[in-house]
Amino acid sequence: MTDRFQLVSPYSPAGDQPAAIDKLVANFEAGLAKQTLLGVTGSGKTYTIANVVQQVQKPTLVMAPNKTLAAQLYGEFKSFFPHNAVEYFVSYYDYYQPEAYVPSSDTFIEKDSSINEHIEQMRLSATKTLLSRRDSLVVATVSAIYGLGAPEDYLSLRLILSIGEHIDQRQLIRHLTDLQYTRNEFELTRGAFRVRGEVLDVFPAESDTEALRIELFDGDIEQLTLFDPLTGETLRKLQRYTVYPKTHYATTRERTLSAVDTIKEELKERLEQLYSQSKLVEAQRLAQRTQFDLEMMAEVGFCNGIENYSRHLTGKAPGEPPPTLFDYLPPDALLVIDESHVTIPQIGAMYKGDRSRKETLVEFGFRLPSALDNRPLRFEEWEARSPRSIYVSATPGPYELRESAGEVTELVVRPTGLIDPVVEIRPVGMQVDDLMSEIHERIKLGDRVLVTTLTKRMAENLTEYLGEHGIRVRYLHSDIDTVERVEIIRDLRLGKFDVLVGINLLREGLDMPEVSLVAILDADKEGFLRSTGSLIQTIGRAARNLRGKAILYADKMTRSMQAAIDESDRRREKQVEYNLEHGITPESVERPISDIMEGAREDAAEKKSGKGRSKSRQVAEETPDYRAMKPAEIAGKLKSLEQKMYQHAKDLEFEAAAQIRDQIQKLKTASLA
């Protein structure tokens, strides 16, 4: 373990990268609050940021617009920093239906959700890392602006153990219970502990493969050991260890009882308001629901929907922002916002949608007004909490450019020498026939084609038409979930089909080097899908191929088209000039075709369990394909496999248990996307 970032990479910065890295680092160290990295597709933006992180040596939070991109970034940073703490913080819900009320039909929808335990463990690991290590890099989505337990409570509850320390066993058990760990003498699972004489085994909630053994003698801690909870194998001995709470929302018994009192006061005030407005049904509903929750909290310290009382549990004033992941960041941290033109508008939108739903619940007596404070951060609150930031995008929005005040660092020249695709404009009248002839040319070369249309109906009709003419074509639409979307892109790269048709094929950040042609139908129809940024992003999908070309079908030149073409020409000019000056011959990007989550798969446990196997053993083992499974199926399969694994371990069949653990690891990784 080290407290310094150590970048591991087989190559060194090239093209525009060295100058960009130097400028970003100099601006950061000069105290510049906001700056923008404008990097074209395939210019190595992630590698550039990794170099910046290594040079500034600050804890880093990287925000991505969706789970798919966050997973890809997590895998890439994990490979760049194998000796450091690279963590993953996204929503842990596989499925989430928030509670809501529809007044027009008098329908109340109960909250329903399914939590992914593996992602919950990774979230806990992320916050622990931020609080305990300087070499921490966390990749997150907008989940980072949603309410979390206060870091002060999280830290005050932790259990610090040292060899030689005097501690009463009953006191130790009580402290673990306060951390919401459960006692289980039969099997040691994550977030549980067991007692055997003067030996306590604890499986930390944020750990995936290591458990802690505390050996006491006459009230003193004699030995602290990390061991494999599955096989019992000793991993290493420790002098000191800190056990963190099982959940971010853990709190003391005193704080819970204090919250019960303040909730009662708020309930009394709210009921008086409702009675004064003659809202008798709402008052009765609120009293009944809240009293039930209060009884649960007083008896067991928890209730369904306890997050709606988070203001009382954290001691915040009405209207104050909730604690979030940003409260866990040290003040000197670095914030990187990837694909900022998408991520920043998302941050602003989260609060408004949440607020309107909650106001209805409060108005009709389903929740107390304090439930409104269980919310994501407002945009201005997020701005106030953000440390020094780098916005990363091929098409930065007006907000990023304004905030950066002209500090825009360009990554236009690619290390591979590739230049931006040639952009051609052709008439709309014969666009489908012209497109078909272009597709046939590309198929002969073994390349792939992306086609983007304006409407779902047009995409469906075009897919059907191309299919009838013998072209292997697929259609990407909004009903396809994230995992299946990634699979379709992977199949396109593998050559299982040649043409992918869709409405919005920007898919920022996804690599498809085999695509040499991007066709944009009806490019002259101004709007969101044909804005300057959208056109540049879509054209960029062909930028990783030596034969890259973009065809815009249009009968007139719009301002967006002109701006996109001008920017593309400017970049090409700079790239060609650089290549001639340095004698560089452009080469297509060679990227192995693998699962987008591959980088995240290769954690220590999987590497360790795979090292000692013979080839014959690997062939004989069944390796099921989990990628096509839906989240609910994955959750069910996980539970079934875990039960089998623990049963094998209980029967001392450690080899069989280890094999199942490998399957679980693959399955958990499949669920990340």
Curated annotation (Swiss-Prot):
SUPFAM superfamilies: C-terminal UvrC-binding domain of UvrB (SSF46600), P-loop containing nucleoside triphosphate hydrolases (SSF52540). ATP binds at G39, V40, T41, G42, S43, G44, K45, T46. Its main location: cytoplasm. The keyword ATP-binding applies. Keywords: ATP-binding, Cytoplasm, DNA damage, DNA excision, DNA repair, Excision nuclease, Helicase, Hydrolase, Nucleotide-binding, SOS response. Residues 431-597 form the Helicase C-terminal domain. GO terms for molecular function: ATP binding; ATP hydrolysis activity; DNA binding; excinuclease ABC activity; helicase activity. The UvrABC repair system catalyzes the recognition and processing of DNA lesions. A damage recognition complex composed of 2 UvrA and 2 UvrB subunits scans DNA for abnormalities. Upon binding of the UvrA(2)B(2) complex to a putative damaged site, the DNA wraps around one UvrB monomer. DNA wrap is dependent on ATP binding by UvrB and probably causes local melting of the DNA helix, facilitating insertion of UvrB beta-hairpin between the DNA strands. Then UvrB probes one DNA strand for the presence of a lesion. Belongs to the UvrB family. It comes from the Bacteria. Residues 601-631 are annotated as: Disordered. It is found in: Cytoplasm. A motif (Beta-hairpin) lies at residues 92-115. Transmembrane segments: none annotated. InterPro entries: Helicase/UvrB_N, Helicase_ATP-bd, Helicase_C-like, P-loop_NTPase, UVR_dom, UVR_dom_sf, UvrB, UvrB_inter. Residues 618-630 have a biased composition (Basic and acidic residues). Residues 26-183 form the Helicase ATP-binding domain. GO terms for cellular component: cytoplasm; excinuclease repair complex. It comes from Xanthomonas oryzae pv. oryzae (strain MAFF 311018). This is UvrABC system protein B. Residues 635-670 form the UVR domain. HAMAP family: UvrB.
